[in-house]
């Protein structure tokens, strides 16, 4: 039979008794544990979370912790903006307990209120912080960049010193009005479904002016066709 850890030198002493009592008190206090998502409701931003650190009995048997329901999921935000992640069952993260009962504060939408119960440091008043320990791929060219990307790196926004780079198989922009202040280079085909209006400067194709001031050779009055632009 496995026995709980003990310090033989302290057994029977007053210091040993205090240490045992203090340890028992700490074992009943929740703080933070690695955890996984059992289920998630995006409308309420609440999840069922299962801590991953198991308990061990004095007989050496591993005992899994019960899942904790109705846990708010952390979303980074402020000033009218936030970042949302599509939380899924099996996602890894951290379950962090609050110091006091926060149920009334959440019921009031984040307004100041008193603790509803005398609960202290329990996962009943916790939040879940999503995290990624592994499974992601970072391109070597982005080793020194701030990166927001999919786990496999197929879609990636990287912020480097002096430039920003977006890599994606497809980019869709739904914007009624778009303004570019500066030069634009298109390396590839371009299709325009609609009118095209150009003001100022010149318009060239293969080095030849095709704008409003361009000229043609071989022009004669009458019904003949003009030549190519010159």
Which residues fall in each region the model found?
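Short, low-complexity, Pro/Ser/Thr/Gly-rich segments in the mature regions of secreted, periplasmic
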Residues: 223-229
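Hydrophobic packing positions characteristic
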Residues: 2-170, 174
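Low-complexity, small-hydrophobic/phenylalanine-enriched stretches
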Residues: 148, 155-159, 163-180, 184-186, ...
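Residue-level signal for pocket-adjacent positions within structured domains
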Residues: 66-68, 198, 223
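Conserved GTPase G-domain signal focused on the G5
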Residues: 15-18, 180, 193, 229
């Amino acid at each position: 039979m496995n026995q709980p850890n003990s310090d033989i030198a302290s057994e029977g002493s007053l210091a040993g008794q205090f240490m045992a009592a203090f340890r028992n008190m700490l074992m009943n206090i929740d703080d933070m544990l690695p955890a996984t998502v059992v289920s998630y409701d995006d409308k309420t931003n609440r999840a069922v979370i299962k801590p991953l650190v198991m308990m061990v009995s004095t007989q050496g048997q591993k005992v899994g912790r019960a899942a904790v329901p109705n846990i708010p999921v952390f979303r980074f935000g402020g000033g009218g903006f936030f970042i949302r992640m599509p939380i899924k069952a099996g996602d890894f993260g951290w379950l962090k307990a609050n110091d006091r009962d926060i149920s009334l504060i959440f019921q009031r939408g984040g307004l100041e209120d008193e603790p509803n119960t005398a609960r202290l440091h329990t996962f009943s008043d916790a939040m879940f912080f999503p995290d990624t320990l592994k499974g992601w791929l970072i391109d070597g060219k982005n080793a020194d960049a701030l990166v927001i990307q999919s786990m496999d790196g197929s879609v990636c926004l990287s912020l480097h010193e002096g430039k920003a780079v977006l890599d994606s198989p497809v980019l869709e922009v739904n914007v009624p009005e778009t303004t570019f202040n500066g030069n634009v280079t298109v390396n590839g085909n371009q299709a325009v479904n609609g009118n095209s209006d150009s003001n100022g400067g010149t318009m060239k194709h293969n080095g030849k002016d095709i704008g409003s001031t361009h000229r043609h050779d071989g022009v004669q009055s009458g019904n003949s066709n003009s030549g190519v632009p010159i």
